[in-house]
Each structure stands twice: as C-alpha cells, then as structure tokens.
Amino acid sequence: MPAVHIIGLGRSGIAAARLLRREGWQVSVGDAGHSEGLVATQKTLAAEGIPVHLNLKFSLSALAELSLDRPDRIVVSPGVPWQLPALEEARSQGIETFGELELAWRSLKQYPWVGITGTNGKTTTTAIVEAIFKAAGLRAPACGNIGYSACELALAGDPLDWVIAEVSSYQIESSPTLAPTIGVWTTFSPDHLERHGTVECYREIKALLLNQSKQKILNGDDQGLIKGLPWRWADAYWTSSHGPSLPDACNGQRCPVPNIFIEEGWVKVEGEPIVQVSSMRMLGVHNQQNLLLAVAVAHLAGIGKDAIATAVSTFPGVAHRLEHICTWQGVDFINDSKATNYEAAQTGLAAVNSPAILIAGGEAKVGDDQAWLQTIQAQAAKVLLIGSAAGAFSQRLKAIGYDDYEIVDTMNKAVTRAAELAPSLQAKSVLLSPACASFDQYQNFERRGDHFRQLCQDLSQ
C-alpha cells in the first residue's frame, strides 16, 4: 500500500486525508499545533484509521523517528510554506510533493474549472460567479479559499457541471498541473512578500494559473495588470469600467481592447447590453470591476443574460467585504475585515460615505501605503488603531501630518469609541478596514469580522 503524509490538520488537510484513505493510500497526518480542537480531530480521524501526529515539525527524519514509512507522496496544506527546507529535501529525494488543491484537481479534472486569483477581489468575484452559475441551473459550487475546501468536493462525489475555485498564490505554487478551462486575474499589487520574497516572484506565481488556463480574463482597470501584462496573452479577454477602451497606460505599447465593459450604465459584452450596473447592491467601483469579471466568465461558459441579471440583482454581497452591518443613529457600520493589505483598505475607505471613522490595525504586512494614507487624509475624520501595528501606523500618520488618530488597542474599545465620536464628528460611516492580517489578535480575518459584527449589533439593539 503506498504511503502519503499530509502536513496540516485544517479543513483542507482533513479532507485530503479522507480522500486519499478512500483511494487506498496508507495515510498519516502531522501538525505542529496541539490545541483542544486538534486533539478532538485527532481522535475522530484515528477512529477512521488515519493516525494524526501533533506537535510535529515536519521532516523526513521526524517521520522516521515515529516509525512511519517513508512517504511516496507528501500533500501540503495551503498555509505551509512551499520553500520549507524539509519540503525541499523531500523533493530532492524524488518524493512527489504538492498541495491539497492539486490533489482535488486530479480527482475532479473531468469537470471544467474556473480558477480565480488576484491580490484583491477574488473572493467577491468567485461568489458572484457561483451565484450566476446557480441562477443558470448549473451545479457549480465554489471552493478553495471560499466555501468548501476543494478536496471536500472531491470527497462528496456529487456530479458537477463546473468547479469554481478561488485560488491563492500559495495554492498555485503547489498545484503544478492545475489547468482551468477559464482563468481569471482580478488585481495585482505587492502582497505576501514575507513568503514569496519579491514582487516579481509573486507576479510569476499568479501568472502560472493563467498560463495553464484555456481561456483568460483580466481586469483592465487594474494598473498592476495593465502595466505589466498587456501582451503576455494575446488571446486574453480584458474588462473595463471605463467603456470600450483602456487608458493609455501600457508602458508605451498599444493597450488591448476590452471585450466586456461598462457603457451608458450597462455591462456590455462585445457591445451587447447584458445587465444594468445599478441592479448591483454592492458599493464601490472595485465591485463593478468584480461584476465585469464575473459576467465575462458567464459569457465564456455560455450562460444567458437572463440568468446573469437575476443573479446580479439578488446578490447580497460577501461577508467581511464592505458588509453593511447596521445603521445606528444615522451612521453606517461597515465590516471590511477582508481588507488585509493597503490596496484593499484604500479601496474600501474610498467606497464608503465620508466623513468616516476608520478602524485599522492588526498584524502589519509589507507594502506601499501611500495611496491608503492619501485616502485617509481625504476621507477619514478619525482613525482608531488596534493590534500590534498600532504604534507603527500612528508614526506613519504623524509623518504625513495627520493627527486625528487614537490608539485604542482592541476591537471592543474601537467600536465603543467610534460610537462616542460619531455625533461630534458628523460621521456617516464607521468602517473596519484593517490593512493588516488578523493573527495578532484573531485566528483569521473572519473571526475578526465576526467580532466586529457582534459588537455593532449589540450597539444597535
């Protein structure tokens, strides 16, 4: 019986373990943690014949010390660094090593896939695509970074029409044969440099997904894409919220002509009106860009405009992405916890009604904060800083001459203080848009957003 070792006991790792066990592999799982939740999962999987080793820092020697067979295959969960020296060693010894998404692809590649990547916008675009496909009567669940883990779909074994996958750079680099029918690139700006090292490396990892996609769709409004990639794929579809042409920003080259664009209040495909932009409930120009990309996917998948219009008009938005929580004393409280980098936070702040009270901070990331700081100066009546980045953010604000900030440290204090300040500042919005990861105070950005939502709902009751 061939042996496989899975690194990581999260949702994707659990599904991968069960899938491989069903396929006849001798499966072991390792995780460096040892929480109560992991112990409970360890017991559950043990009852299924899948041994789990906690407090295990992966290496081939560590597996040998546990008397585990040398694995024929290693499957890596998305959060595990692909360049981990122990993984490099395994690959050098000829052990097949890849990610959970690659495993799912190998099990589900008989179906057409939509693969959606990008620094920002990929989750919302994925959710709109899923809604459109559902309105068209297609069995096309979203997976990857949204909805199911990809291996959960494979494990379920249900017949599908399409697989719609939100794909991160972490998943792309560990999925060497993933080849979607339709590949989408929403935006590009520096992110995850602590893992990928350079902007160029990050860009090339993202580009791999489109290189291997049969049909390609890119956002022509995004400067990171239009400046760096206009002619890499001559057959690509481009979108534009500015009509049937792109700004002359293609590094001296002639810009590609958009196939899907907004004109006279309509999303048009090759000039044909498909859906009115005003039927979409979500805020912001960036969500118009997401809509365009989703309509482009639907068009290439052969979905009619009636299903598109129905899905768009009823789509409620996505949790933690400019999610309207409540209106309290005339002030809108908005959850944008998914804004984990400067570009996303700048976009969120620009989209809400001003003057706004901004709640920002968390675990800081490397990136260019200039546009974000400029938008704060223009839109924010007050900035309330939380988390480990609060001190550094206060220094950045002070350096640009912006003094309307307070360090409040925690979300509880931030929401309470925002409610106190809103009347005197005549604020129209209180926005959580952190520009940071969440891991200093929360397990993930969803937990952070859930906490903010609960505090706002308590306030309004």
Curated annotation (Swiss-Prot):
The positions annotated for binding ATP are G118, T119, N120, G121, K122, T123, T124
Q: What EC number(s) does its UniProt record assign?
A: 6.3.2.9
Q: Could you state one GO biological process linked to this protein?
A: cell division
Q: Which reaction does it catalyse?
A: UDP-N-acetyl-alpha-D-muramoyl-L-alanine + D-glutamate + ATP = UDP-N-acetyl-alpha-D-muramoyl-L-alanyl-D-glutamate + ADP + phosphate + H(+)
Molecular function, one GO term: UDP-N-acetylmuramoylalanine-D-glutamate ligase activity
- Gene Ontology CC terms, in alphabetical order: cytoplasm
Gene3D superfamilies per the UniProt record, alphabetical: Mur ligase, C-terminal domain, Mur-like, catalytic domain, NAD(P)-binding Rossmann-like Domain
Pathway(s) the chain acts in: Cell wall biogenesis; peptidoglycan biosynthesis
Entry keyword set: ATP-binding, Cell cycle, Cell division, Cell shape, Cell wall biogenesis/degradation, Cytoplasm, Ligase, Nucleotide-binding, Peptidoglycan synthesis
Give the domain of life: Bacteria
Compartments in which it is found: Cytoplasm
| HAMAP family in the record | MurD (MF_00639)
As for family, the record states: Belongs to the MurCDEF family.
Q: What is this protein called?
A: UDP-N-acetylmuramoylalanine--D-glutamate ligase
